[in-house]
Amino acid sequence: GTYSAGCVAAKELCEKYPERRITVIDSLCGSAGLGLLVYMTAKKRDEGADLDAAADFAEKTKLTIGHWFTVDDLVYLRRGGRISPTAAVVGGLLGIKPVLHMDDEGHLVSFSKARSRKKAIQMLCDKYGELALSPKENPAIITHGDCESEAVELKKMLVEKYDANVIL
């Protein structure tokens, strides 16, 4: 995958530029989670951390980043082999909206199911409240795929309920 490709690229670059040091980290993150890890690690660098300290920080921090999300359409979960065709059809007819997360090994895991999009968004808000450490200091990043109004609503919920530092 991406980590293996990074290791191959690092090896080639180290051979070409032996005076430089490259550290590759398996972030176990995707999308905005990776962006958040890079942001937090760059902050450490800006505070004076050297390469080893920054890499150590990233290794320790990667498992504290939660990836929680919901999808509106089960088609892509079916196409990706995450759910059966029957489950996709039945779930679609019943209006099931799964709440998913990435586990500590980088695998997509189903956490819960909601009977409406609004309830799924509420579950995301509640899960944030359970898991967030220092919500004001550690940013939460909300991304969306063409559902900006719901992302704005989730941000509003997190800020009002938890005084969260949210990046949208």
Residue ranges and their predicted role:
Residues 2-23, 29-168:
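Mixed-charge interfacial surface used for oligomerization/domain docking
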